[in-house]
Every structure is written in structure tokens, then in C-alpha cells.
Amino acid sequence: MHVKTGDEVLIITGKDRGKRGKIKESRPKEQRVIVEGLNIVKRHMKPRGPTRPGGIIEMEAPIHVSNVMLICPKCGRASRTGHRFLEETDHKGRPKKVRYCKACDAVIDE
């Protein structure tokens, strides 16, 4: 996936189009992310004992990763990302793979 937990993203489609938020949770197997405070849905929950009462609860629903765009921390614009290998190596001796902003060519992962 082109985004990770903690990244700031822009929603590009749907009811929250144009809003920004931080990724709270990522689900790589489902290709979905949960963005803080966005894509709010109402769930009708059944009571689950004295500690969890029932009722209508608002919660954040997952969004497909194709509907979000990473906001570059360097230039502040929503842009596409790419991957490249650095000269330095990781702990296993392989070249380090990092994401970069295609708009300003800055490395996102340090």
C-alpha cells in the first residue's frame, strides 16, 4: 500500500471528498484504511451486558486506499508516491526501500 498508519491523507472521492485526516489504522489484506474523524457511519448496536449499552453509535468506517492520497510532509501537497532503493542497507544487508513524493521528489520515509 502507498500509505501507512500515521500518514496524513486527503480523501479524493466520496462524501468526505476534500477533507484531510490522519490514518488511524491500516488493513493491508483488505486494501483499506481508517482515517480519524472521517467516513463516520451510524451503527445500531445491541446491548452487550451492563458495561456496553446498546443504541446508535457513530464510528469511523474503512475507506479503500484508492480513495485517499498521501499529503507530502515536505511540500504539503497531495501527490502520488513512488518507491526507490537507497544506497544504504537495512539490518539484513539489502538495499533500503523508501517512499518518495512524485511532486517534489522528497523522500517520505526516513
Swiss-Prot record:
SMART domains to which the protein is assigned, alphabetical: KOW
GO cellular component, one term: ribonucleoprotein complex
Record bears the keyword Ion transport: no
GO biological process, alphabetically ordered: translation
A Pfam family of this chain: ribosomal_L24
Statement: the UniProt record of this protein carries the keyword RNA-binding: yes
Superkingdom assignment: Bacteria
A GO MF label: rRNA binding
Swiss-Prot/TrEMBL keywords: Ribonucleoprotein, Ribosomal protein, RNA-binding, rRNA-binding
Its job: One of two assembly initiator proteins, it binds directly to the 5'-end of the 23S rRNA, where it nucleates assembly of the 50S subunit. One of the proteins that surrounds the polypeptide exit tunnel on the outside of the subunit.
Quaternary data: Part of the 50S ribosomal subunit.
UniProt xrefs under NCBIfam families: rplX_bact
Family indicated by similarity: Belongs to the universal ribosomal protein uL24 family.
Annotated protein name in UniProt: Large ribosomal subunit protein uL24
Protein source organism: Roseiflexus castenholzii (strain DSM 13941 / HLO8)
